[in-house]
Every structure is written in C-alpha cells, then in structure tokens.
C-alpha cells in the first residue's frame, strides 16, 4: 500500500512539474540570455573582441585609404553601443513581456550603460576624422533621450545629424544607410542584428537569412562587426515568418524549431 502511495505521489509530482514547464511564461524565456548579458565574463569578452577587431580594421583602412571621400562608420544603438539588459530584467521580474510603454519609460530615463569597448572605439574613430552615425529603430520621440544617454556615456558626434531614428513605422535601415553613403565612404557597420548590415536580411525567413550569411561570409570581421545578443532579435521574427502569433503559438514554433538527435 505504501509503495502504491509513493508511486501515485511521484506521478502527481511529475504531472505537476510538466504542467509548470508547459505553462506559457514568456518573460522567463529571457532569463538565461539576460543573466548571460549581465553576469558572464564571456559576454563582456565578446564585446571587447568585437570592438578590438573594429579598431584593427579601421587602422588598416586609415593606413591604406587614398580616397578623398570622407570615411564613416555606421552603428546600431541597442545592444550594440547601449546595454538595455536592465529593462529586460525588469520585465522578467515583473512577469511581463516587451511592451512599448515600459520601453519608453526606460529610454526616457537615459540610464543605459555603454557596451564594453564601445566608447573607446568610437572616440578613436572620431579622433581620426571618421564620422560616426548612430542608426537606430528607436522612435523619433525617443531621440532626445537617446542622444542624452549617448552623450552621458561619452560617445562622440552625438547630434541630430548623426543620430538617425526610425521615421514612421518603417524599420528597414537601408534608406538611412544609403543617405549616409551619398556623402561618405561607409567602411564599417556595427550591430547585433543582421538587419544592421544589409537589406539582404530584412524581413527574410530563417533559411534565407542563413543562406545570405553564408553568401556574405567575407564581410564578417572585415566590414561587418557583430555584437552578441541572446535576448532578442529579428532571428525570432524570422521563425514565425512575420505572422502575428500569440505567446502560446510562438512557444510551439520555438519548440518545433529545435534540432535534436
């Protein structure tokens, strides 16, 4: 009898545990990624590595460049030069997912810290006559706070011309990159998202994004400098191919996308 009771108790425990795992808790998906960004030395090392490589490439370019066209570097802002992990952590602790209202509160605080190595690299670029453009998909009404945050962290050339926010609902950065390219030779692009580099990756499904990465192999580390980001990105949107899915539906797509053996 005791043995049967123990077996029943174990079954109830396992069913309860499975239910907890299966329950949709979207904010908890970000726990590991956010902790990694905030606590791991490996994350910091990868950031330093990216900006060290960017500096080496820029040094090479400056030594060999003979064009009269002024040089420029284009960078993304979020998770490329500014660390927004406190916003993600707050969402997790409050059991929330990303929402524009809470994001606006965070942006207006202008308290994001600089990514490791970012300030040093961009000041090096500016000191050598290179123009630094910050192309971000933050909204126009977030521009003032964004500029304040960048200035407080010590980034150079932070003004209305160099900080280019999203206009309207268009998230594609290619028109803004082309605007810079009309006057400058863009020698480096820095970002955490493939859309920060080329229109090849904008709103493409997973297979096409990955195929285009392979086609662009020569640019990574030479013209494209990629920062790590394990908390969010357009790679997720690519999984559900632009469909408007509920949290539960996104869960199903994620589980179905895992490759085991």
Report the location of each language-model feature.
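C-terminal cap/substrate-recognition subdomain and adjoining C-terminal extension
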Residues: 24, 41, 139, 143-261
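Sec-exported extracytoplasmic/periplasmic mature domains
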Residues: 59, 63, 87, 123-131, ...
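Asp-based phosphoryl-transfer active-site loop
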Residues: 72-84
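Short, acidic loop-to-helix structural element flanking the phosphoryl-transfer center
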Residues: 105-133, 140
């Amino acid at each position: 009898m005791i043995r049967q009771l123990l077996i029943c108790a174990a079954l109830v425990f396992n069913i309860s545990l499975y239910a907890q795992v299966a329950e949709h808790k979207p904010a908890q998906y970000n726990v590991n990624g956010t902790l990694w960004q905030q606590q791991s030395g490996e994350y910091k090392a990868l950031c330093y590595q990216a900006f060290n490589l960017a500096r080496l490439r820029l040094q090479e370019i400056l030594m060999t460049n003979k064009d009269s066209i002024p040089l420029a570097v284009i960078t993304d802002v979020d998770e490329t030069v500014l660390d927004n992990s406190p916003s993600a952590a707050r969402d997790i602790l409050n059991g929330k997912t990303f929402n524009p209202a809470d994001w606006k509160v965070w942006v207006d605080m202008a308290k994001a810290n600089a990514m490791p190595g970012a300030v040093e690299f961009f000041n090096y670029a500016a000191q050598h006559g290179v123009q630094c453009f910050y192309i971000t998909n933050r909204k126009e009404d977030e521009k003032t706070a964004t500029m304040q945050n960048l200035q407080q962290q010590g980034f150079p050339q932070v003004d209305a011309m160099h900080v280019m926010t999203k206009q309207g609902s268009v998230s594609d950065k290619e028109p803004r990159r082309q605007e810079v390219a009309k006057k400058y030779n863009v020698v480096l692009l820095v970002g955490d998202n493939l859309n920060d580099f080329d229109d090849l990756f904008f709103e493409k499904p997973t297979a096409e994004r990955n195929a285009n990465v392979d086609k662009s192999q020569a640019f990574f580390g030479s013209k494209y400098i990629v920062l790590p980001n394990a908390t969010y990105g357009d790679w997720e949107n690519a999984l559900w191919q632009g469909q408007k899915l509920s949290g539960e539906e996104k869960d199903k797509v994620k589980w179905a996308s895992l490759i085991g053996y």
